[in-house]
Amino acid sequence: MYELIQAKGGSYYIESPAKVGLVQLGGDRVCLIDSGSDKDAGRKVRQHLDANGWHLTAIYNTHSNADHIGGNQYLQKQTGCAIYAPGMEQCVTCHTVLEPSLLYGGCPPKALRNKFLMAQESQAQLLTAEVLPEGWELLPLPGHFLDMVGFRTGDNVVYLADCLASRETLDKYGIAFLYDVGAYLETLERVKTMEAALFVPSHAAAAEHIAPLAQYNIDRTQEAAERIAGLCTGVTFDEVLAGVFKAYGLVMSLPQYALLGSTVKSYLSYLMDRGEVAAEAEDCRLIWRRV
């Protein structure tokens, strides 16, 4: 774990629970794509920098989930590097309580204000194509989270962030966290057509060909949508959520309630907007039915 692996040319990644990209910029200058899950991950990254005599100039965050920005604060304090995050992700990176607030749907209790859902705050600037290193391409990858992006480096290495879950993860859990199901499916259709020297997803193995895994994610997402639609039998949201937990053999906890609850609501929004389910008020309860 935390091994530095060369993808191609000056494009590397650090093998970790959420992969960290590292790209040489010329001379001793390097930048990162994301920073890992916490301060300890930041220290592991710093060890690679020191061992190679590299100077960190910037961190380009793909999105603001805690496991991708957790090393930001430590590395920024240690190196003075700039940090960039896209769109609404910039706000969450600077004000990290927004992530558990969004997931929970209100002021989050202390039990949700932990490093898994709420990273340390860092000073991030808005990420645009203009601030990227020369030869890079900014790749919009919405769906998993608010304004997630990926990057294509000058070595033709594509860093795909969280737009793909591994087969192992999907086979084990059946359903993955999503913010916007429709945008996610559209993103995966675009990813299927991409070509690169190497694709580096954050939570799946690096691969030269990404289309098979993208299609597997599409299939499992559509299966989850159909399963959730089938649970809408004139029941409340909590009953739908309980049905999802039971169907996938998951264990209820407060963090899982926030993560999966948010995901199920996103699926319900997707299904409602497609006219496949409807919500009606009955006896002071909101009831979900398949149309």
Feature roles, as predicted:
Residues 37, 137-223:
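Metallo-beta-lactamase
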Residues 10, 23, 34, 49, ...:
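Divalent metal-coordination and catalytic microenvironments
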Residues 14-16, 132, 141-145:
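A short catalytic or substrate-binding loop motif that flags glycine-/basic-rich loops and adjacent residues
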Residues 8-13, 35-38, 59-62, 136-141, ...:
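Short, flexible loop segments at the rims of nucleotide/cofactor-binding pockets, characterized by
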Residues 227-291:
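C-terminal regulatory/interaction regions
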Residues 1-52, 150-162:
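Conserved beta-strand hairpin/beta-sheet module of binuclear metal-dependent hydrolase folds
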